Amino acid sequence: MKRIVSGDQVKVISGNEAGKVGVVRKVLYSSVGRRKEVYVIVSDVNVRRFVKKTQAGKKFDAKSYPIAVSNVALLAGDGFVSKVGFKLKDGTKKRIFKRTAEFV
């Protein structure tokens, strides 16, 4: 089970976008040799805007770029950043906030 999944509300903790809050839209996994990397695409964070030329004129477009999962942290229900742990509940593994000990 993964610590951050799509649909989670996260806060960017480092980089140019530090302090911004958004919802994870997609989790991307890539491997280069033996190194495995995990990236997330967060809505309204790390967005680049550009102009496309069309026959009708100019069209403004925006694209979200991935952020390394180590640069984001999960937001707990009280609005503060929390680490994620795991507990067994009814025989299944569930994620919990370590800060509040509540289930995600």
Curated annotation (Swiss-Prot):
Taxonomy, superkingdom: Bacteria
Signal sequence interval, chain numbering: none
GO cellular component: ribonucleoprotein complex; ribosome
CDD domains: KOW_RPL26 (cd06089)
UniProtKB keywords: Ribonucleoprotein, Ribosomal protein, RNA-binding, rRNA-binding
Entry GO MF terms: rRNA binding; structural constituent of ribosome
GO BP terms in the entry: translation
Annotated InterPro entries: Rib_uL2_dom2, Ribosomal_uL24, Ribosomal_uL24_CS, Ribosomal_uL24_KOW, Translation_prot_SH3-like_sf
Quaternary structure (record): Part of the 50S ribosomal subunit.
Similarity remark: Belongs to the universal ribosomal protein uL24 family.
Function as written in the Swiss-Prot or TrEMBL entry: One of two assembly initiator proteins, it binds directly to the 5'-end of the 23S rRNA, where it nucleates assembly of the 50S subunit.
The protein's name: Large ribosomal subunit protein uL24
Gene source species: Neorickettsia sennetsu (strain ATCC VR-367 / Miyayama) (Ehrlichia sennetsu)
Gene name for this UniProt entry: rplX
